[in-house]
Regions:
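Short, conserved loop/helix-junction motifs that constitute active-site signature segments
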Residues: 27-33, 52-55
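A general structural motif
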Residues: 17-19, 64-68, 179-180
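Long, charged amphipathic helices and adjacent flexible linkers at domain junctions
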Residues: 163-190
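Adenosine-phosphate binding glycine-rich loop
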Residues: 38-146, 150-157, 161
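A structured beta-alpha segment of the ubiquitous adenosine-cofactor-binding alpha/beta core
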Residues: 1-29
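Short, well-ordered alpha-helix to beta-strand connector turns
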Residues: 10, 33-34, 57-58
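Glycine-rich, charged/polar anion/phosphate-binding loops
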Residues: 1, 20-23, 46-47, 62-63, ...
Length: 196
């Protein structure tokens, strides 16, 4: 069976291969409102504008910063490690990974802060087809994801240094946001100038 056969009526395409694998003809055959996750970098399996040209109802995500819904491991890795290190997790288990993903998903549904709106001026920041996941420079990630990871580590029994007061822990993480602000601002400005 080929991809062309398998894609007929599919709700989802998850690409982790190479450029040009998914064609416009294939996209036409997908189910209503297909979710197309074209993750090959730097050139995805299909460019978003090509998919949208034949399927305006398609919901797309790529690994590229110059398109909506950039899927980037920077959304999870620093924060899952922060939580794991802070509670002395003996391993990073499935519960912690799920907690990380859920915290990121929940954050996408919250209203963007003024800081995020300023960093991504002119971009859609309300949950929907063009904004499924938070932006990489959303400072709320450091306040939400590690707390969820720590909680999951404690509940699953892998935290060797449980954190009693999660709200105090959350507040301590906020200090990283302020400390990182001066460091991150030049990168945010550069990203605005040349988003590729």
């Amino acid at each position: 069976r080929t991809l062309d056969d398998a894609i007929d009526g599919a709700d989802l395409f998850m690409g982790l291969s190479g450029p040009g694998v998914l064609t416009q003809d294939m996209v036409k055959k997908m189910a209503d409102k297909p979710l197309i996750l074209a993750m090959a970098n730097p050139t995805p399996e299909i460019m978003p504008e090509l998919a949208k040209a034949v399927r305006p109802d398609a919901i797309l995500a790529t690994g590229r910063s110059d398109y909506p819904n950039q899927v980037n491991n920077v959304l999870c890795f620093p924060f899952i490690f922060r939580g794991a290190l802070d509670c002395g997790a003996s391993t990073i288990n499935e519960e912690m990974k799920k907690a990380c993903v859920k915290a990121i998903a929940d954050l996408a549904m919250k209203e963007a802060t003024d800081v995020v709106a300023e960093a991504y001026a002119g971009e859609e920041l309300t949950f929907g087809p063009e904004y499924l996941i938070p932006k990489p420079f959303d400072a709320r990630l450091i306040e939400e994801v590690p707390v969820a990871v720590v909680k999951a580590a404690m509940e699953s029994g892998v935290a060797t240094r449980p954190i009693e007061d999660l709200e105090a822990y959350r507040k301590s993480l906020h200090e990283f946001v302020n400390a990182a602000g001066l460091f991150m601002q030049p990168m945010i400005e550069a990203a605005k100038q040349g988003p590729k």
